[in-house]
Amino acid sequence: MDASRPLRIIAAAPALEPDTEAFYEALSELIRVYEFRDRDRICCYDISVSQCYALEAVVRGSELTLNDLAARLYLDKSTASRVVDALERKGYVERQPHPEDRRSLLLRPTPAGREMEQRIRRDILTEEQALLADFDPEICQAMTQLIRRLARAAASRVDAAGGSCCRIP
């Protein structure tokens, strides 16, 4: 042992609550199902899942720049740029000069992009409607509120500026 270096005592991680583990397992399963469902549905439209998420953000957002899109999708700028490049080649998105910032470009959906996003959205919402049909409306509303709250809480813990591998805030 090197006497010049202080001894570091690492405390054992506290045991996870059973609810935490059960929650994690249930949420992980739901995410896996939705990821598969998204890949399965979206690939029918000759568009990747990342491109679909970006197209949805551009159609549903207002005045998005590439930096805005990257932050919204938790992507680095170069990855977001490649996704937008593909959407632009397919004729779904166009870049236009920002009226207030000459160094920046705004992402705008083309009419074909709007139509594609609406087709995919209708397909997915039809699936969601079938999924929720067995639940009472009050349960659906409560689930929606809880999922939104969970998404906000999770987003507040994400380092969108590049991640924090191996570090939990």
Regions from the PLM with identified roles:
Residues 44-48, 79-82, 86, 136, ...:
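Short glycine/proline-centered loop/turn elements that form peptide/ligand docking sites
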Residues 39-43, 129, 155, 159-162:
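Short, flexible helix-adjacent loops and helix caps
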Residues 1-45, 49:
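N-terminal leader segment of winged-helix/HTH proteins
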Residues 34-37, 61, 116, 123:
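A short secondary-structure junction motif
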Residues 2-6, 85-148:
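Charged, amphipathic alpha-helical coiled-coil/dimerization segments
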Residues 1-16, 138-169:
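C-terminal regulatory/oligomerization modules of transcriptional regulators
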Residues 36-79, 90:
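N-terminal helix-turn-helix DNA-binding core of bacterial DNA-binding proteins
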Residues 31, 56-60, 121, 148:
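Short, locally clustered residues in the helix-turn-helix/winged-helix DNA-binding domain
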